[in-house]
Every structure is written in C-alpha cells, then in structure tokens.
C-alpha cells in the first residue's frame, strides 16, 4: 500500500469439442484507499453476469462437451445423425475445483525464497560473503518463512486475478474474487493469524489509491480503464504488500505509463539497502519515471511521479511503520537499517503528479492512540470492540464489517473517526481525466543481501 504525504491457478474455461469420437479428457496521506467514482457505469445485464467468473472461494472449470451433429453412414449408405438435438448437446457441465490451503503444497513449512539482490553500496560488500551472518540470520529470523508464505499466496492470488478479470465485471465481483482466494489459500477468514493484510485496492484512472467497493457499489470495470490492483497478505502479522496495474484496451495506449512505473519501482528496489539514504532512492526513482512520456489522442503527456505518495516500512500488524520511501528527491537523509522490511512502491501520472482525498471512504484502521480516545455512545464502544477483536491494527473496510455481522454502523463509525479512535483513508485522486499507475514490491533487508520476497514471473 502507498503512503501519502500531506494532512492461476488460472480460472480456465475449457471447451472440449466432441465429435462422434470421444475426446481425451490489483499533502502526506497514508495510503489505504478510496475515491469518488470517475464514471458510474451501468451494470451489465443479468445474463452477462451469470457467465462471469465466480467470486467465491472455488474456481469454476467449465467443460463444454459440444456434441456436434455429424453424419454417419448406415450400411445401406444413407446418412444418420446423432439422436440428441444439437441444442441439448451444448449443455455445460460445471465442475467446481476448490482452492486448497497453501500449506498442502508445502507440508514441511518451507516456502519459496524471493529474488536475492546484492546491496548497492561497496561498503556493504563484505555482507554477501559472510556465512556466519547468513547462519545467524536464519536462526534469529524464522519469521522470514511467514513473509515467504504470504508472498507465495500473493503470487497465486494475483495470477488468478490476472487471468480472470475482464471488462464488464463489477468492482465488487473483482474484490470478492481476490479476497476469497486469499482466505482460501491462507485457510483463514479475516483473522489475526493469517489472511487479508488490508482491503484490496482497485483504484481506477485518476484515482491513485484507497478505493475498494462498499456494499451496494455498482461500478463496472470498463475496457479503457487503468486499474491499480493492490493486494495485502499477512501471516502472523507479517505483511506482504505488492501491487500491479492492469489495462484492457486494444491499442495499448497505456503501455509507456505502465513501463515507466514498473521500471521506476525496480529502480527503487535495486537502489534500496542497508545504510542507503531515503533521498537517494527517491532521486533515482524520479530520474527513471520522468524520462518517459505517453501519447493519447494525438497529445503527448509527460509521466510524472506522484510526489506526495511514498513507499514505507512495514511493522508487525502495521502496514505503515515509521519511515517513508520517497519517489522524488526530497532531502531525507534517513538511512535504511538491517532487519527492516519495506514496501517499495511508485506511482506515475499523466496529471498534476499530486493527489488529494476525494469521495466516499471505504478504508479505515485503528489509530495509534485509539485506547486513549474518548468514545461517547455504547454503540460506538461496541463497534470499537468488534474492530479491535477482528482486525487489530490491520486496515479494514466497510465490507469486512458487513462480513462479521455488523449492521447500521455508519453513525457509530463516524463517531469513532471524530473521536480519533479510527483513522479514515478516503480515495486519493489526481486531476480528473488523468491516468495513474502503480507497481510495488516488499523487500526484506537481511544482513547479507536483500530479498525481493514478492517477486514473481509477472513483475
């Protein structure tokens, strides 16, 4: 997830064509997110929705034995056709393949490591060859396996999302698809042991971050939308925060925007390391990002860093913990330190390169001082207790309150926000009509090397 600065398993549709022979068998604000909808599109027809990818914890494999009417020759030479009418032969046989826990694939509890990279500074070169440091790192920090487990869940969930999401799906369908997959792979509902690390960000176009649908949201993904997909997975409070951007247009007009942001994020990852100054990372990211431009409708737009959005370090059960990683040169001489975990994320925009909060809020989290807050009504106190017991200090959204059985809670929720017990994170947007993109990775600063734990074949 981003931090703002100011006040698949592929879901496969298998079509098997049978003939008469049998065929073989994603100011300084903290980036949790929401924004007003740039376009409220009409929902698709019910018939279309019925054919969309299922959004529950199972994936649907559709086998379509289309028994084509074929001519066979009788012994007398006259043709005969199959007895069943063609329409009846096109029935779809739906089989549900259940997603199993990630633990079943790794029964020994040892999960794939991420991408290892050397530290950039020469003064750290001794770290790479230190066998003792690597041994002590493994002995001290067995929580690395929690990060690797979360990262493997993340890779599988995003592969499923990338292969399943299509224009015409509602944002709620997309959010359910992703979040139910996380719950299934983690073998946990929204619990404090494992599962969803923060609400799934599905911000469109000029909305850079913090949008996820609330109940009743009818917004539909369009073919010309640019969608940032920000997914969080945690295991025992160790959060993997990684994001990517999806486009669906036929003429690939957004390619340079995505290329700029992806390269900028990889630059930030490459420059990060123990004793590296945060300003130096921001300067390197800015140089790469702002070397790009893109053309839309015959007009050329420079691609700008969104200067009041940042990466951040990650704490246990805390998505934004202290340090911020700028994506422009900002003079911050703070250094990264051994053992820290960072989300390196960058945002590019064709707009102003600056975001402001707008629209209906969906993202929330307990404030650091929530225990000292003076909460007035009994209903607000009860809601606070529900939030604390279900989510702790992890971010959450209104849909999660619905899921745990809360009803008619908006008044009490607003009271908690006003009392300072809960922090709200509305959507943050650039100039109307602009386009924004995001890529993000989680990195672990081991004593000897850094591990890009969320790295995959896709980005």
From Swiss-Prot:
PROSITE patterns: MAP_2. It comes from Meyerozyma guilliermondii (strain ATCC 6260 / CBS 566 / DSM 6381 / JCM 1539 / NBRC 10279 / NRRL Y-324). The keyword Hydrolase applies. Residues 88-99 have a biased composition (Basic residues). The keyword Transmembrane does not apply. Its EC number is 3.4.11.18. The lineage of its organism: Eukaryota, Fungi, Dikarya, Ascomycota, Saccharomycotina. This is Methionine aminopeptidase 2. One of its GO terms (molecular function) is metal ion binding. Transmembrane segments: none annotated. Residues 63-101 are annotated as: Disordered. One of its GO terms (biological process) is protein maturation. A divalent metal cation 1 binds at residues 230, 241, 440.
